[in-house]
Amino acid sequence: MLAPDYPITTERLLLRPVHESDAAAMRAYKSRADVCRYLPHDVLSLEQVTERISTLYANTTLEDEGQSLTLAVIERASGVMVGDVILFWRNREHRAGEVGYVLDPAFHGRGYTVEATAALLALGFDGLGLHRIVGRLDARNTASARVLEKLGMRLEAHFVSNEYLKGEWTDELVYALLEGEWRMRT
């Protein structure tokens, strides 16, 4: 079980559960076609974001495999929500997890995605005792691949025409990091 003490603090960011009051800030980036291009959903309306906050993003703990924890990423200096990150608990027996992230393009290029995702990796390895964490992405999303590489994750798979996404077959990349590798980096 994982029950973090919130907020989770990094050098420049706070990570905390997503609140209903975050809906407008989240909609600002999740309603953009360029942001949603590589995501498994289309652009979201304010109503759809609000619904997700009360359902998909409602967990504040992870109690069993199959659950996910979505956290708001807040810039400490301004108090502004800059994105969200997610930790999936994929398999208890194999101690497997997955990370994901979405950042408002207004905050790209500052290293926030790497900083926030590093905090998620720490939660997964230190808090949940995971052995392996992966990141999966559309192969065309080179910016996302760079994030995972900066975190020390290695490319383990390139699946050709693996997913039918938004009317086209897309390639998928899978990056991974083992707990021991994480410990050597931190």
Regions flagged by a language model, labelled:
Residues 1-37, 54, 70-186:
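Acyl-donor (CoA/ACP) binding surface of acyl/acetyltransferases
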